[in-house]
Regions:
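Bacterial N-terminal signal peptides that target proteins for export
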Residues: 1-10
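C-terminal motif of bacterial Sec signal peptides marking the signal peptidase cleavage site
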Residues: 18-21
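Glycoside hydrolase catalytic-domain context in secreted enzymes
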Residues: 23-253
């Protein structure tokens, strides 16, 4: 019995050596002998046709501003602190490009802060950002928030079903209306920017944030994403980023 087992082990080892030898012989080709593969990125990624066209005047102004900025000012524009970790004086000193309120963050750490409280904080931080007495910059800051199914961090705001429920409706037109209502309420609290829509396509229900996905069907997520962006920002040829709209950021994909 033991001889039989030993024979099988030896045979297996010999086969392994032979396979390795064959593989080594096949892999001796020089890198120079390998034919280069064509770049197929253009076939994989569709060509974008963006409705909001570039504005030459704006682009020129941006270039002018960038040419006068110090490295410290440029770095500050790429930093987004959370409202629990900055003060008005910090904003005046550093001139952060943006800031946010994460989950459980409220003006003055007050869960029951009123819309007026939110506006008051937004105004203080805005005025500090354009004060050039310390950082030499007058670039205005922006406030971003997670308003993914209504302005859900604010007491008294209109809340809608979460994304998984909205996806079950399979109604892009309804979702656009919801996004527009959300934009109005976000603007009413002095906030400029919403981190939505979420375009995660959930396929594994073990994920703890499955409810944030509209659907496991990419087609539904695609339709909804376009509707939410339009609802938040407005149509390119109509009220794009008017005083009833906010900036949208597609996220979590």
């Amino acid at each position: 019995m033991r001889k039989s087992i030993i024979a099988k082990v030896v045979t297996g080892a010999l086969v392994g050596v032979l396979v390795s030898a064959c593989s080594a012989e096949k892999n001796t080709a020089s890198v120079d002998d390998v034919e280069p593969q064509p770049n197929k990125a253009g076939e994989v990624w569709p060509k974008l046709d963006i409705e909001v066209k570039s504005n030459a005047t704006v682009e020129t102004k941006v270039e002018e501003i960038l040419s006068t900025m110090t490295i410290e000012q440029k770095i500050a524009q790429m930093i987004q602190p959370e409202i629990r970790n900055i003060t008005v004086e910090d904003m005046r000193k550093y001139g952060f490009g943006s800031y946010l309120n994460g989950g459980g963050a409220f003006p003055n750490n007050d869960k029951h802060a009123t819309p007026e409280d939110w506006v008051a904080l937004a105004e203080k931080l805005y005025q500090a950002s354009i004060d050039d007495s310390l950082d030499g910059s007058t670039i205005p800051t922006m406030w971003g928030t997670d308003a993914v199914h209504g302005h859900n961090n604010v007491i008294g705001a209109t809340l809608f079903p979460h994304n998984i429920g909205l996806g079950a409706a399979n109604n892009p037109e309804l979702v656009e209306k919801i996004a527009h209502i959300t934009a109005k309420e976000v603007m009413a609290t002095g906030i400029d920017w919403v981190f939505a829509p979420t375009v995660a396509v959930v396929r594994d229900d073990r994920w703890g944030r499955t409810y944030e996905s509209y659907s496991e069907d990419p087609a539904i997520v695609r339709e909804y994403a376009a509707s939410v962006v339009k609802g938040l920002q407005g149509a390119a040829d109509k009220d794009f980023l008017s005083d009833q709209r906010v900036i949208s950021t597609v996220k979590h994909f």
